[in-house]
């Protein structure tokens, strides 16, 4: 039996970012539910998502991916903004960096997903705060509130260094997010920039047309 899966980078449990962003997500999901928001979800930055396979295939892929990746800087956060997609409604943008972009490209290749943010646009790392089809006025209010509550805290804005990847079952048809579940948490390799450079060079060589 197959499911829809995602690979997430989650902030350290119990840290300021995880606690404060989680509280904000839960509060806004409840407040905006009458306006088309989804249920609450765990704070995360999606490394790659929307791939379909069996549980065993997903687990095997996540373990191999973690073995191929170094620790990933998910930092800093630039601002809070809004978007036009259900799963990119209101979110905090992460400043792109080579390691994060390379990790996304490697993950996309591993799970057979087209790299990027869709429509030919590049990967846009972000931490979602609201999912849903929410009126623009409510999005604007949420952006302002998140900016005031989250972006003024240096411990939040500074982001984190991802030391693991998490495998989540994410049925995108479930607007409540109640069926979403984490099924695996896999530590990343502890290697530095030299190995990252090799990963990047190897990836470019594999993906360049002949």
Residue ranges with predicted function:
Residues 1-77, 82, 94-156, 174-210:
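Basic, often amphipathic N-terminal segments
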């Amino acid at each position: 039996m197959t499911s829809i899966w995602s690979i997430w980078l989650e902030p350290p449990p119990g840290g300021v970012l995880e606690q404060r962003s989680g509280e904000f997500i839960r509060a806004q999901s409840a407040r905006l539910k009458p306006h088309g928001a989804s249920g609450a979800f765990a704070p995360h930055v999606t490394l790659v998502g929307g791939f379909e396979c069996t549980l065993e295939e997903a687990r095997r892929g996540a373990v191999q991916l973690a073995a191929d990746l170094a620790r990933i800087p998910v930092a800093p956060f630039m601002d809070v903004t809004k978007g036009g997609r259900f799963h990119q409604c209101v979110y905090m943008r992460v400043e792109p960096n080579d390691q994060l972009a390379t990790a996304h490209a490697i993950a996309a290749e591993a799970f057979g997903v087209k790299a990027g943010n869709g429509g030919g646009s590049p990967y846009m790392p972000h931490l979602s705060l609201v999912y849903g089809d929410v009126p623009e006025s409510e999005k604007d209010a949420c952006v302002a509130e998140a900016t005031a509550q989250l972006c003024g805290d240096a411990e939040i804005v500074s982001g984190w260094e991802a030391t693991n990847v998490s495998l989540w079952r994410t049925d995108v048809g479930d607007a409540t997010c109640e069926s979403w579940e984490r099924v695996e948490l896999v530590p990343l390799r502890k290697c530095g920039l030299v190995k990252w450079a090799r990963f990047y060079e190897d990836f470019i060589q594999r993906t360049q047309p002949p």
